[in-house]
Curated annotation (Swiss-Prot):
Gene Ontology MF term list: ATP binding; iron-sulfur cluster binding; metal ion binding; nitrogenase activity
Cofactor(s) essential for the protein: [8Fe-7S] cluster
Positions bound to [8Fe-7S] cluster: 69, 94, 152, 187
Family matches, as Pfam families: DUF3364, Oxidored_nitro
Free-text function comment from the UniProt entry: This molybdenum-iron protein is part of the nitrogenase complex that catalyzes the key enzymatic reactions in nitrogen fixation.
GO CC term (a single one): molybdenum-iron nitrogenase complex
Alphabetical GO biological process terms: nitrogen fixation
Record-listed E.C. numbers: 1.18.6.1
Family statement drawn from the similarity comment of this UniProt entry: Belongs to the NifD/NifK/NifE/NifN family.
Recorded name of the encoding gene: nifK
UniProt cofactor note: Binds 1 [8Fe-7S] cluster per heterodimer.
Protein known as: Nitrogenase molybdenum-iron protein beta chain
Species of the source: Rippkaea orientalis (strain PCC 8801 / RF-1)
Alphabetically ordered keywords of this record: ATP-binding, Iron, Iron-sulfur, Metal-binding, Nitrogen fixation, Nucleotide-binding, Oxidoreductase
Subunit and partners: Tetramer of two alpha and two beta chains. Forms complex with the iron protein (nitrogenase component 2).
Amino acid sequence: MSQNIDKIQDHVELFHQPEYQELFENKKALQGMASDEKVAEIAEWTKTWEYREKNFAREALTINPAKACQPLGAILAAVGFEGTLPFVHGSQGCVAYFRTHFTRHFKEPFSGVSSSMTEDAAVFGGLKNMIEGLQNAYSLYQPKMIAVCTTCMAEVIGDDLGSFIGNAKADGSVPQDFPVPFAHTPSFVGSHITGYDNMMKAILLNLTDGKKPTTSNGKVNFIPGFETYVGNLRELKHLTSAMGVDATILGDNELYLDSPNDGEFKMYQGGTTLEEGADAINATKTIALQTYPTVKTLEYIEKEWQQPTATYRPWGIKGTDEFVMALSELTGNPVPPELELERGRAVDAMTDSHAWLHGKKAAIYGDPDLVMGMLQFMLEMGVEPVHVLVHNSTTEFEEEAKALLASSPYGQKATVWGGKDLWHLRSLLFTEPVDFLIGNSYGKYLWRDTKIPLIRIGYPIFDRHHLHRYSTIGYNGAINLLNWIVNGLFEEIDRNTNIPSKTDISFDLVR
């Protein structure tokens, strides 16, 4: 064996060793797999227009989805509030998946519990699990609030969360006045952004239950949406502070998802206080930074709180300008020199790199609001989007995206693909290649197959560290986006021009 105490091989090298290569060959023979030549033949066929037509004729099969299920978004909304423990009414396996999904992206512990439903609960209902689960969660983890959502199992059998929680309180599992907001989050409907919306609405409804708007507190509420860049929360606080806005961020998970290593574990870090959440009903306005994960929440605020709402996407120069000017109009404060300086730096950086991006063709996939923000920025840089794919799409998103693309000379060649998955995108990239692809870590398989460089922007990002700490919004965020894209293209140029005396005529020191 090449792996021994004197010669430790990491996993990158280990499986290239002869004994493992022999094992893999024996496995292929045992399983009766097709020959390498046949696999290569079929692989080539999947790159053709003929295969693309068959691929797009799929109706009842998803291959490599570009979305997740509702509870994932629900628990992200929950941890944005002080001392809140997400409680998933369903099996342990589901909540383990949700927690590891966030832990791998943020590189932080992510707390959450389940009602541990098994076969008996699937037949007889999960009331007993709810009663015992809430009691254990309350006594063991001492939260200030428990936010309950559901998985497929609980939804298929029709468990009534409101009734179950009421019975649990009557049974003494938690005090009667203890806040237990709940949201039904069936995974077979919508996606993670729907779950975020459902839980955010449920928490605000619970915290303001029985309250009516009184005298305005002079504050402005901000709802980040399904936000996986903690740098964006810091950037939001920076922009609102610079503009003199008395802001309440509803669902502030910045510290929870980017906590310091100070030698002491804290289960609940940061978050919007429950008092701030309850007082949000008295704000002058609520502003969302994402449209599609806040639809029901904003409808609730407008109807029940009688509070005006608005949505802004501060991506790129134009989007940030609109956001900053809206804050200026809201407060009556002028734009401070600090933000003018940041804007000038962003414009200068974009001017420096414009020649390298102008006219480049791009493909992008991700959540609706992230894709809209990136389209705004790319069009400002003269990038020409070709494939715009959103798996968790809606008719409203597709109309909005098409209108944005039609408004720019650089968006005329783009096609919006709603409800399509990453296997669809693979066909698109082979039949209509582009210069670069923007997406999350799952795009690396598209990069491997098509050799189209991947710029990692989105969620989840598992295979690169610390990108979630940066901002993508504001003037500072525009510089980050530019940095990732243009330097990603430079890396690709260097990879393609590094053979001495053959391709290195453009292996330049200065770009």
